[in-house]
């Protein structure tokens, strides 16, 4: 294709080049050429002016389940200084208040933790509206019990008596292999499963763990129907703030959820490459990897830095 450029567009009234207009045009070229720009040298600050709202993943971007990354907190502070909004949007299968408490114990300020919104909270709203009186079988660890605290009397121990399945993760004593869930679920594919975390895996420090999404995938492969809550599905974006016509950048380390969610919503995206996909990125051409996942990534950064 051919683009004609009037250089006067980039100049202000005093004939000085307008840096903001140049940056906007640079972003435009990256978009139409489907190029991924690496921000490791320039930092997020090089493109932050262009956006009004930032959806930022928690696990793998802000913390690793054990410690908070200092550079990511600097990013949040700088976004605030620019009078722009950020939302810490996470596929955690628990209510907002539980996850906020969890990261505060790691040292997060309450002012920052108040920006946390979870897939569990989105699922909870749906469950209270549609399934509050129905009996369910819970698949997941005890730490997720807070999700259904207001209707815990409907939780039953016998899966055969359940009207629906609520999946928040894996049982603590069955969290290494998925074959157990194939046997557990095969006779119950006519029931609906509500999955509160579409993520397939997560890294807790240096240990990789299965998430609820892996169990839901087993259920779907058996022929069951799953109602998902969390990225990449749209409901989770709308629970936290009014988007209106604001320019949005989604930041995360997961191509299946963070980046695909941005693509579904027509938002720009930044992939943190030293996260879930770090080994795949090392072993593959980055463009081929994105093609394999069928996603478009606008920016790449090894770790979130300003």
Describe the function of each predicted region.
Residues 2-9, 16:
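Extreme N-terminal basic, low-complexity initiation segments
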Residues 94:
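Conserved nucleotide-binding/hydrolysis micro-motifs of P-loop NTPases
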